[in-house]
From Swiss-Prot:
<dbReference type="InterPro" id="IPR043266">
    <property type="entry name" value="RHO_NdoB-like_C"/>
</dbReference>
<dbReference type="InterPro" id="IPR036922">
    <property type="entry name" value="Rieske_2Fe-2S_sf"/>
</dbReference>
<keyword id="KW-0223">Dioxygenase</keyword>
<dbReference type="GO" id="GO:0008695">
    <property type="term" value="F:3-phenylpropionate dioxygenase activity"/>
</dbReference>
<dbReference type="InterPro" id="IPR001663">
    <property type="entry name" value="Rng_hydr_dOase-A"/>
</dbReference>
<dbReference type="InterPro" id="IPR015881">
    <property type="entry name" value="Ring-hydroxy_dOase_2Fe2S_BS"/>
</dbReference>
<dbReference type="Pfam" id="PF00848">
    <property type="entry name" value="Ring_hydroxyl_A"/>
</dbReference>
<keyword id="KW-0408">Iron</keyword>
<feature type="binding site">
    <location>
        <position position="108"/>
    </location>
    <ligand>
        <name>[2Fe-2S] cluster</name>
    </ligand>
</feature>
<feature type="binding site">
    <location>
        <position position="87"/>
    </location>
    <ligand>
        <name>[2Fe-2S] cluster</name>
    </ligand>
</feature>
<protein>
    <recommendedName>
        <fullName>3-phenylpropionate/cinnamic acid dioxygenase subunit alpha</fullName>
        <ecNumber>1.14.12.19</ecNumber>
    </recommendedName>
</protein>
<comment type="similarity">
    <text>Belongs to the bacterial ring-hydroxylating dioxygenase alpha subunit family.</text>
</comment>
<keyword id="KW-0001">2Fe-2S</keyword>
<keyword id="KW-0058">Aromatic hydrocarbons catabolism</keyword>
<comment type="subunit">
    <text>This dioxygenase system consists of four proteins: the two subunits of the hydroxylase component (HcaE and HcaF), a ferredoxin (HcaC) and a ferredoxin reductase (HcaD).</text>
</comment>
<feature type="domain" description="Rieske">
    <location>
        <begin position="44"/>
        <end position="142"/>
    </location>
</feature>
<feature type="binding site">
    <location>
        <position position="213"/>
    </location>
    <ligand>
        <name>Fe cation</name>
    </ligand>
</feature>
Length: 453
């Protein structure tokens, strides 16, 4: 097996000087190491609690390329298991979601309870006359499963920091989506899934760090939908709220720490000029007082923003899109997109959120297609030997990082910077090159201390 020292990880990433070698997006050995040391050691989003409300409810997803099933237990707790029969490695759960009393392998009929225990083996007395220790052959359980305000995460590594410590200061930014109203959030509708022919790090980096692209990649949408905001509840494109926020915002910042990233504008209006139908904008205006009381002015107004929890959980404030970038190969990622809304919103508002999220950021969304085209074209170019071994510039905002004194936490910069991208690649390199989580944490702390000198 190729080792981290063979790959010279830190020769491919130079975050202190803002350099990245695009071989990191194409190398199959790097990809295999990512599956082991990133997706095998980091906290990964599994599901929202609203998707499995009752005992026996399950949801099938992935941790890296490993299929897992998340199940609500009889006592209300949540477990996750490798979706693999212990007999011949067959998948035991095929439906995307549902409710069940047991998971039965279609190959030889081995059956497992929702707690993962092997409960039935067909023809057991005749097939195993010597006896079979069924307690030894239950489903492989994900050892670490925790929830944060409705979001369920899993981790294979018992030595990893707890979920809240892992999130760190990104939790403050995440709360701006999860904690706007009493009752929290829920997933509306199903999951939209599609494949993009690019490396998973392209979308993760963009959602962590890149507001810069919107001025150019989404220029056509800005031109078509950039009408003045008249404060009405008109539908998108009919003179309401699509004016680009960078034209009206008072200020903006980017957060980048521990591999996570976020960026947002300081806006003046509760609807924040986001790419949504007027019904959604009206909802934000009507619920602003509650959000401000719970979150404070900055986060209550923070509806135009991009975010990524390392490695692959992204969301956009305002447009209600939550998505996971499931890696499929060095040059392919599968997108799973959810619509997340306040649970207290009316059914009509939830439907408007879902329509707006799909229109802008669904697989055929007028903004999503701009992004996908960029990532796919880059991946095509990186088939070239010189292209994938050149150096790329990651210097935007280099040396301008600061910690604020107004209660906004973490390492920050102006929104048009690459602080979060540099931090993401530093955490990426630290994970790939370290044998233990403590080593990772020490390296990341040293990097962040150097950044803030």
């Amino acid at each position: 097996m190729t080792t981290p020292s063979d790959l010279n990880i830190y020769q491919l990433i130079d975050t202190q000087n803002g350099r990245v070698t695009p071989r990191i997006y194409t190398d199959p050995d790097i990809y295999q190491l990512e599956l082991e040391r990133i997706f095998g050691r980091c906290w990964l989003f599994l599901a929202h609690e609203s998707q499995i409300p009752k005992p026996g409810d399950f949801f099938n997803t992935y941790m890296g390329e490993d299929a897992v099933v998340v199940v609500r237990q009889k006592d209300g707790s949540i477990k996750a298991f490798l979706n693999q029969c212990r007999h011949r490695a067959m998948r035991v759960s095929y439906a995307d979601c549902g409710n069940t009393r047991a998971f039965t392998c279609p190959y030889h009929g081995w059956s497992y309870g929702i707690n993962g225990e092997l409960i039935d083996v067909p023809l057991e007395p005749r097939a195993y006359p010597q006896g079979l220790c069924k307690s030894h052959w239950g489903l492989n359980e994900v050892p670490c499963v925790e929830s944060y305000k409705g979001l369920i995460f899993g981790n294979w590594d018992t030595s990893a920091p707890g979920l809240r410590d892992y999130l760190g200061d990104i939790a403050w930014y995440l709360d701006g989506m999860l904690d706007r109203r009493e009752g929290g959030t829920e997933i509306v509708g199903g999951v939209q899934k599609w494949v993009i022919n690019c490396n998973w790090k392209f979308p993760a980096e963009q959602f962590a760090s890149d507001q810069y692209h919107a001025l150019f990649s989404h220029a056509s949408a800005v031109q078509v939908l950039g009408a003045k905001d008249d404060g009405s509840d008109k539908r998108l494109g009919d003179g309401q709220t699509a004016r680009p926020v960078w034209e009206t915002a008072k200020d903006a910042l980017q957060f980048g720490q521990d591999g996570h990233g976020s960026g947002f504008f300081f806006t003046e209006k509760p609807d924040a000029n986001v790419w949504v139908d007027g019904a959604v904008s009206s909802y934000y205006r009507e619920t602003y007082a509650e959000a401000e009381q719970r979150l404070g002015e900055v986060r209550a107004l923070r509806l135009a923003g991009h975010n990524n929890i390392f490695p692959t959980l992204s969301w956009l404030n305002g447009t209600a899109t939550l998505r996971v970038w499931h890696p499929r190969s060095p040059d392919q990622v599968e997108v799973w997109a959810f619509c997340i809304t306040d649970k207290a919103a009316s059914d009509e508002v939830k439907a408007a959120f879902e329509n707006s999220a799909t229109r802008a950021f669904g697989p055929a969304g007028f903004l999503e297609q701009d992004d996908s085209e960029n990532w796919c074209e880059i991946q095509k170019l990186l088939k070239g030997h010189r292209a994938r071994n050149s150096k790329l510039c990651l210097e935007m905002g280099l040396g301008q990082e600061k910690r604020r004194d107004d209660g906004i936490p973490g390492i920050t910069n102006y929104i048009f910077s690459e602080t979060a991208a540099r931090g993401m690649y530093q955490r990426w390199a630290d994970l790939l090159s370290s044998e233990s989580w403590q080593e990772v944490l020490d390296k990341t702390a040293a990097y962040q201390q150097e950044v803030m000198k």
